[in-house]
Amino acid sequence: MLKLSEKEAFETISKDQLIELFKMSAQLMLTIDGLWFVEAEKIMGIDQAMKLDQGVWRQFGSLEANRMKKFLTMESVATLEDVCKIVLLSPMWVSVGPQAEIQNDRCYLSVTNCLPQKARIKRGLSELPCKSMGTAYFEGFAPALSPNLKFKCIFCPPDKHPNDVWCKWEVGWF
């Protein structure tokens, strides 16, 4: 009988395959959230589904920030470079085409490939007005990274947005 551990299975694939596996896992995480939301929307309507989802994303933002800090052995986040690194490596962000740039003492985070929105459009649904969910996420995420870290939405549906960027957020100590 052959027994393999998880670690041994991971060691049988290349670094590039590990990266792709991570990206696929991140996409699956958002897929299950999207599928849950569509079913909740059918049962209870969009307003109640959004209210539930906001609570989930607020908790998730805090949990993700704390786990990423632990994974990266960061006790606290002291620089915008740290913020960008955490975002670019986090499972939630990896699957949405993240872009991070630092300009004028601010970190600007953009979503360029929003899989949940694309899936809704493909199903014939309208864009989800997800600004309140993004806000809830950052209400948990930003202070968990650093108590005085602030965020501001530049645009997010239902706001108008460019075709190549779904939402954009400003993060910093302001």
Model-derived regions: residue spans:
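N-terminal accessory segment detector
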Residues: 1-108, 115-117, 121-133, 143-168, ...
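Long, well-ordered alpha-helical scaffolding segments within enzyme catalytic domains
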Residues: 134-138
